[in-house]
A protein has these predicted regions:
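Short hydrophobic/aromatic beta-strand micro-patches
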Residues: 265-267
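Oxyanion-binding "anion nests"
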Residues: 201-251
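Short amphipathic alpha-helices in soluble, non-transmembrane regions
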Residues: 274-284
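Conserved glycine-rich beta-strand-loop-beta hairpin in the small C-terminal domain of fold type I
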Residues: 257-262
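Short, solvent-exposed loop/turn elements at beta->coil junctions and helix N-caps
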Residues: 250-255, 293-296
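Glycine-rich phosphate/pyrophosphate-binding beta-alpha loops
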Residues: 253-255, 325-330
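Conserved PLP cofactor-binding pocket of PLP-dependent enzymes
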Residues: 285-303
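N-terminal Rossmann-like NAD(P) cofactor-binding subdomain of oxidoreductases
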Residues: 1-207, 245-246, 270, 297-300, ...
Length: 356
């Protein structure tokens, strides 16, 4: 089996990365190296068309089959829900702990849904699979947890501004291909937008995204909400441990390559003291206060940034803020690797290696 030996000085863990050639999987591989994860071997897996491809560091993509998945301590998945449902439990049965970045297991009761800074103690109850939250939920959780601990969260209204990269590399590529044809005629953009939009095709996003805002992403349900919006509600409840949390979500796609933003109106059980709220946010790990947080400024950065923090004009128990984060890093790959690190630190993986 082709892999990278000795990744992490003194490491003894064998790590599989499933979906290694995708946008998130590529970042996972980079982070495993840059963060010196204690691995003796890292093996990339991907679709059949990528098998045999040589990645950075000389890693060679392996096929997913019962002959190749044995003997791993940790398996990091970012290959979509269908692939996760098919293969995650098989990795577990072969001895690995799986950290899954898809939606496959997030709503399963006995699968922990974890943000590394928010609820790492949930890892202790895992039965072989740990779920990574949706990238939009992830970005919002850090400030919400800090404020929940201070004032007890009761409800929230959240509007997301989600980057094209939330749809994967194909989402980025589609936006990039639309920019030049539309930018070539600014007058048409201003005076006949429908004709301008018709000059390009779209298949990934619900409408032409360049120079536009698209208030629909995900699958629309009978109640008028998309599955992306339901994820934001359901995952927030599970991660924060507030089953009755009232969430009113709206998810919007914006013409940004990487970096999600969320405007949040959070209402608490207690009256909010602004200075105490700012102190709680400033003290929270991996969260920075920024007067003007923008997705572009935080693309490629590990931190989540929160700003425009202000008391509501109508309700003293309500706080408004805007939060941004890189959807490929903290929103996906970084949290996945952080969860693997936390599993190791808590002694929850490596039994096979220890017994060897």
């Amino acid at each position: 089996m082709s892999g990278l030996a000795g990744a992490g000085a003194g490491g003894r863990l064998r790590v599989a990365v499933v979906g290694a050639t995708g946008a998130v999987g590529t970042v996972m591989l980079r982070l495993l190296g840059s963060r010196a994860f204690p691995a003796s071997e890292i093996v990339p897996f991907a679709s059949e068309r990528s098998v045999g491809r040589v990645l950075d560091g000389g890693l060679v993509v392996e096929p997913l089959d019962d002959e190749t998945i044995g003997g791993f301590d940790v398996a990091l998945f970012s290959a979509g829900a269908t692939r996760s449902r098919e293969w995650a439990q098989r990795f577990v049965d072969a001895g690995a702990v799986v950290v899954d970045n898809s939606s496959a297991f997030r709503r399963v009761d006995d699968v922990p849904l974890v943000v590394s800074e928010v609820n790492p103690e949930a890892l202790d109850a895992h039965c072989g699979i740990v779920a990574n939250p949706n990238c939009t939920t992830m970005v919002a959780m850090l400030p919400l947890k800090a404020l929940h601990d201070a004032f007890s969260l009761a409800s929230m209204v959240a509007t997301s501004y989600q980057a094209a990269g939330g749809a994967g590399q194909s989402g980025i590529d589609e936006l990039a291909a639309q920019i030049a044809p539309l930018a070539s005629d600014v007058t048409q953009l201003c005076e006949d937008g429908a004709t301008a939009a018709g000059k390009v095709t779209h298949a990934v996003h619900a409408a032409t995204l360049a120079f536009n805002v698209v208030p629909l992403l995900g699958t629309l349900g009978d109640d008028g909400h998309t599955d992306e919006e339901r994820k934001l509600r359901d995952e927030s409840r599970k991660i924060l441990g507030i089953p009755s949390l009232a969430v009113s979500p709206t998810c919007v796609r914006v013409p940004v390559m990487v970096g999600h933003g969320v405007a949040v109106r959070a209402t608490f059980e207690r009256e909010v003291d602004l200075e105490r709220a700012l102190s709680a946010l400033a003290a929270f790990p991996n969260l920075v206060l920024d007067d003007l947080p923008t997705p572009l400024a935080y693309a490629g950065r590990d931190e989540v940034a929160v700003g425009r923090v202000r008391l509501d004009l109508a309700d003293p128990r309500t706080l408004n803020f805007f939060v941004v984060g890189d959807n490929l890093l903290k929103g996906a790959a970084l949290n996945t690797v952080q969860l693997a690190e936390a599993l190791v630190a808590r002694g929850l993986v490596g039994a096979r290696a220890s017994a060897a």
